[in-house]
Amino acid sequence: MYPEPRPAPCPGAYYEYNNRMNINRRSLLIAGAALASTWRAHSQNSGDVIIVQQVVDRIKAKVGIPWLAETVDGLIVGSPGIQVHGIATTAMATLDVLQRAAAASLNMVITHEPTFYSHQDATGPLATDPTYLAKREFMAAHEIVIFRLHDHWHGMTPDGIDTGMRYELGWDGHQVANSDGEFTFATSQLREFSAAMAARLGARSMRIIGDPKLPIRRVIASWGYSSLMPDLIKAAARPDVDLIVVGETREWELVEYVQDQIAAGANKALIILGHVTSEQGGMKYCAKWMKDFIPEVPVEFVPAAEPFYQLKQR
């Protein structure tokens, strides 16, 4: 069983977090030094040794496409020669994810999304930021390596995120042949369809536009971020498409478009899952994929906690 995410804190918890930052930082450094010593002692007694560069080389060999010259993928934190004791895959390498990975002795983290708050993982503006520094210090203390796998995981055939989300939702037998994210189902109401999705994904903050009684038969899914144009305008305009499912989008693009469709009399619906929720299954599948060519160490999926909650849940 993978390490469970902690629930997203209520807003007041951040004040306590800020007050205790320095104390927690010292505690993490002490604990990290002890854990690193344990890892080194274990490695001396184990015949299966693998370093970061070997893992990276195997990933590059297995993705099935040439490695891009311009890409966000690659080693974000750590060096190629560090010994790997265990691997965690995750949608987003939050500090909470890193803490749970370290506790499970997984010191190489394969993340789909950025670690340092921008798509390019640019850290220049963060040089003196206390949250950034705390995260870096935790990783250094626990000898954690971060490798990003975004562009090439999407670039695989089939797309690694798409494959994992189909498995996670139980939609594998519903995809329209030779389509990109199009599915057909036996007719059910939007209320029932969205509830089934929420249950499968453990989603607690998905947002829905449309009549709860709307019959759902044909669905277009686009995981992660999706723009109306040029990504989804043709699909959303199709009269035979009942529902669009995305991870996130701008409210003045796809959201407004679907609202206007409904106001004009069209039978349409939109589900916004949240970015992490909409790609989490893809990184769960990534762990399964990597186990086939990384036998030396454990490979586990460590889910990122859904960051949002609804007031009624508190």
PLM feature spans:
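N-terminal secretory signal peptides
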Residues: 1-23
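Hydrophobic structural segments
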Residues: 22-314
